Regions:
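Iron-sulfur (Fe-S) cluster-binding segments and ferredoxin-like electron-carrier domains
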Residues: 89-94, 106-113
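Short cysteine/histidine-rich metal-coordination sites, predominantly Zn2+-binding motifs
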Residues: 96-103, 114-124
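N-terminal export signals
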Residues: 1-21
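Short, solvent-exposed loop/turn motifs
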Residues: 53-55, 106, 115
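Short loop/turn microsegments at loop-to-beta-strand junctions
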Residues: 73, 103-104
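A short, acidic/glycine-rich surface segment
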Residues: 65-68, 111-115
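N-terminal pre-ligand scaffold of iron-sulfur
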Residues: 14-95, 125-154
Length: 154
């Protein structure tokens, strides 16, 4: 028979050391994108957020959608850079999707930019919006990684 010996090690921490530490956060600018009056149902408006190197689209659907803001909960905004390879996508008003010409990924704009087809491995980056009392639409954050960036999520 073989005998084995083992040792157990323990680390003792003070309560201060054991407290959860906040992770680093990305601070986003609160950019005004448009006014509700500027939007037409199912007509995309080109925007950029959080900076000029991040193209996006602002959409009004006329009925409440996932992540929608405004009086009807029908206004959303997304990055138009495909999360697969960064191709610039176009909006299809027929099926309310953003479509990539590169490898044919498709994303449902009524369901939070959820991927419905193609090679992408994540949903679209959705811009977090707020509507003020004057109807101005402000972007204040991003909920997914924008293609080509290493850290832009909250």
């Amino acid at each position: 028979m073989m005998a084995t010996a083992g040792a157990v090690a323990a680390t003792v921490m003070t309560p201060e050391q054991a407290r959860a530490q906040a992770l680093a956060r990305v601070d986003y600018p609160a950019n005004r994108l448009a006014n509700i009056a500027d939007l037409e149902v199912n007509e995309p408006m080109d925007i950029a957020y959080p900076d000029a190197d991040s193209p996006g689209v602002l959409l009004k659907f006329g009925q409440a959608v996932e992540g929608g803001v405004g009086p009807d909960g029908d206004i959303v905004a997304f990055s138009v850079l495909c999360p697969h390879k960064g191709w610039l996508m176009s909006y299809s008003p027929t099926d309310k999707t953003l479509n990539c010409p590169g490898h044919h990924s498709r994303f449902d704009c009524e369901v939070g930019g959820q991927q419905i087809w193609g090679h992408a491995t994540s949903n679209l980056a959705q811009f977090l919006l707020r509507v003020d009392d004057q109807g101005d639409i402000h972007a204040e954050g991003v909920d997914e990684l924008i293609y080509g960036r290493l850290s832009n999520v909250l």
